[in-house]
């Protein structure tokens, strides 16, 4: 029996969304991708560099899919363009906050792929905040869009354990693959008409606000474990930062340092150089700093930093 494919619009921009689009195309689903919506080309590595397509646009062009670049999702013209396509379903993965005039155009609904186990970590930076908080489990959620951000009825969840040394970049890569599986499963349920949703429990809500210059600065007045979680939660971008000698100092990678000799931690943020390794103190112990970047310099490992720059034990980070 011939089944008319569902007309699908995919909306996404960064690397995180790429596996989902690829999975939709590769899966044996009764869907037709009638439009891919993404952000406009922009310089993405350095200021004043040549504009580059988004990762999603690059893949869409490779796959021969039509692409629409949108600057302002609230522009009435965008909503009209979506309506003209007569979508059955809209899939959103790491895109923008859509107005009802856009997501309401989908006959069977619009759903979002979110990189947390909702209602935990609602917001713009769920992966980062889960790691910063020391969570041992993360995952993805698909849910139907409604007016309040990240509050819609849940379609399905997929969970995964978090390794204690895993950073935000690594976890994002894993969750993008798990998320692609979730998107395909969700579409299959929608196509079959077998979706069963559940409301989010508001008593379990936690927030994952946007990362800023202010909330990515290292506060050394916390435990060594919390410092390590903060650093890996922001690696490799936007990166945890502090100051040293009045200059910005980024820390990309750290490790717990239980084997550091029983030296008094001193004031939180104290630097210790021992055995060719670089350490910094928290309130109850040490972390080892493994890779870093001084203001105006390229990223380097701690060994290179110690060989090339004057550094002494007892100096305070954050100064």
Swiss-Prot record:
Gene Ontology cellular component terms for the protein in this record: cytosol
Keyword DNA repair: no
Pfam families registered for this protein in UniProt: Formyl_trans_C (PF02911), Formyl_trans_N (PF00551)
Assigned keywords, A-Z: Protein biosynthesis, Transferase
Entries under CDD domains matching the protein: FMT_core_Met-tRNA-FMT_N, Met_tRNA_FMT_C
EC number: 2.1.2.9
Ligand binding ((6S)-5,6,7,8-tetrahydrofolate): 116-119
The keyword Protein biosynthesis belongs to this UniProt entry's keyword annotation: yes
EC top class, as a word: transferase
Catalytic activity: L-methionyl-tRNA(fMet) + (6R)-10-formyltetrahydrofolate = N-formyl-L-methionyl-tRNA(fMet) + (6S)-5,6,7,8-tetrahydrofolate + H(+)
GO MF, any single term: methionyl-tRNA formyltransferase activity
HAMAP family, per database record: Formyl_trans
Role: Attaches a formyl group to the free amino group of methionyl-tRNA(fMet). The formyl group appears to play a dual role in the initiator identity of N-formylmethionyl-tRNA by promoting its recognition by IF2 and preventing the misappropriation of this tRNA by the elongation apparatus.
Family, per entry: Belongs to the Fmt family.
Protein name: Methionyl-tRNA formyltransferase
